[in-house]
């Protein structure tokens, strides 16, 4: 992960757009699964497990420990979301012709599995997927526990 990110050119990154995309992706990737779990009247630990869906498994397990979510369920949710995201990405992204955009989408939505698939599409797609996954992991790992633990 570090080598492709070190080789990436950062001078042409649209920073404002990327920050907006990152914030929207992170918040929606947490809020939508949590909201669905809440609407289905699932238990609080299960809802907390769904909150970790936004990040890759190692980061999700650390967040889950802070949120007291069941670790096995977190692992299942995160890995399944990555597999499903990678499986449906060719269909969902078929009209996206910008390698940077499709890579970022794969990294944000399908984590490590999506990043591996992005590398099969090409080095630019893979770099942006790795960048999206890494930055989203750091961002979500910081705001999510603070937000959840500050709720009454």
Specify the residue positions occupied by each region the protein language model found.
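Transmembrane alpha-helical segments of multi-pass membrane transport proteins and ion-pumping complexes
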Residues: 1-5, 26-38, 57-61, 82-94, ...
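Alpha-helical membrane segments and immediately flanking helix-loop junctions
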Residues: 3-5, 46-71, 79-84, 98-135
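Entry/N-cap segments of selected transmembrane alpha helices
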Residues: 8-33, 75-84, 132-138
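Membrane-helix interface "capping/anchor" motifs
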Residues: 10-11, 96-98
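A short, structure-level motif marking secondary-structure boundaries and short turns
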Residues: 17-19, 45-46, 100-101, 149-150
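Helix-coil boundary and interhelical linker segments in multi-pass alpha-helical membrane proteins
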Residues: 35-46, 65-73, 148-152
């Amino acid at each position: 992960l570090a080598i492709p990110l070190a080789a990436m050119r950062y001078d042409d990154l649209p920073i404002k757009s990327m920050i907006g995309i990152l914030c929207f992706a992170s918040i929606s990737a947490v809020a939508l699964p949590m909201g669905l779990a809440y609407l289905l009247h699932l238990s609080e630990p299960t809802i907390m497990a769904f909150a970790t869906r936004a990040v890759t498994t190692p980061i999700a397990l650390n967040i889950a420990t802070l949120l007291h979510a069941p670790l096995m369920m977190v692992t299942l949710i995160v890995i399944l979301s990555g597999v499903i995201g990678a499986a449906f990405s060719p269909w969902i992204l078929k009209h996206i012709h910008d390698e940077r955009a499709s890579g970022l989408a794969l990294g944000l939505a399908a984590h490590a599995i999506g990043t591996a698939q992005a590398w099969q599409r090409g080095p630019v797609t893979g770099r942006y997927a790795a960048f999206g996954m890494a930055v989203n992991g750091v961002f979500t790992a910081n705001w999510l526990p603070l937000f959840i633990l500050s709720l009454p």
